[in-house]
Amino acid sequence: MLLNIPYHLENFIGGNFIGPLSGNFIDNINPATGAVYGQIPDSNAKDVDVAVKAAKKAFPAWSVLPVEKKFIILNKIAELIDENLEELALAETNDNGKPLWLSKQVDIPRASANFRFFATGIMHFANESHQMEDKAVNYTLRQPIGIVGCISPWNLPLYLFTWKIAPALAAGNCVIAKPSEVTPLTAFLLGKICKEAGLPDGVLNIVHGTGPHCGEAIVKHPDIKAISFTGSTRAGQHIASVAAPMFKKLSLELGGKNPNIIFNDCNWEKMLTETIRSSFGNQGQICLCGSRILLERSAYENFKKHFISIVKNLTVGDPLDEKSKQGAIVSKVHFEKILNCISIAKEEGGTILCGGNAVKLTGRCADGFFIEPTIIEGLTQDCKTNQEEIFGPVVTIQPFDTEEEAIAMANNSTYGLAATIWTQDISKANRVAAKVEAGIIWVNCWLVRDLRTPFGGMKNSGVGREGGWEVLRFFTEAKNVCIQF
């Protein structure tokens, strides 16, 4: 199929593409060029209400559709994503600024994997039963909630959009989904793919717009019974404050200030390779990035020398150039925020070991938003730079002397999303993993994902878990039936 992209995107509601009721649009900017190359609907509560009505109409039939038939449709969506990988990857890169090779190798394949995984998973999602000897039998039904809201971020647009939508649909719900207004293209194209795959009208409704206008309306709508959100902790706090009095189910995957704990007995070459990825992958715009690098003191200077040498050779360039290792920052606002964070780090006494500046390219990217990969040392644990999420190509490095000190430093954060531990001592790895306050721990690797496992954070990094059975439980209501005999 040919995924044509119009200049003016439209909402996907009730199986149709329609403009915003207000007639208002927002500019869509390519971060690599700084140029406007399209417009998206500036949707509001009225558009959301139309989407909810379409979802309510579709829900009775979709909720009882046999899982074998749901599998066929959801698996077809996965196949069409694979078939259109080139077009989807280019759209993702133009919207987000990430290197095209990354969109092709990671983002789009993962989007199809999300649909394929939950298409299969729902067929094995079993109800529970408990027999009370000679008294009674209990069985627990897992039934779809109804209409749910899925709000996704701009850093991994289609990857995380489908991570929410696929299990929600598989569980029998109808969805009102809002992609980030900064990266709307692949969400728009997903609507076309779902239509082609035979997803019934109204089962998935994609409404574009800003958080205050559109996202707020989704959270506040009385007929939307659950909200799955990925984004900043501040936005998550606001969503929780709005949704809690309405008793909505909430899944909030929020920020992180993740420690990368490196002991001197690790596999050195593998650690360096993966630490480059975990520090600067997707320009550091991944909530799981290890932005606080904690090193055993005996390895500190050697690591610093090799790390700086590698980082200085990371090519920052046009995302369409296959030689570019680092692409553009997603928006001018975020670009300016990151540069301001680097200035604050200097004011706090940090030493810039590498990077720290905007990058000025030539040609089509002359007005794009590019920043050098940046390494900072000499900061205290409690300073703003080490405590607040920057969400960019910026890492700090700090030494530690003992295992206990490493754990204390790792836990010195209001966040608790992820952590990475590097050591060949399996006993040490288990001790540290048990004590680090994070929902996801990687040992001698980073971002190795099994979609069957729980995904989510502790402390200010969120509420609830996604992935596997956890997310299917979230998107269903448990009903216990007790029969006495």
Predicted feature residues:
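Rossmann-like NAD(P) dinucleotide-binding subdomain of oxidoreductase/dehydrogenase enzymes
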Residues: 127-270, 400
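Hydrophobic face of amphipathic alpha-helices that form TPR/SEL1-like repeat modules
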Residues: 1-32
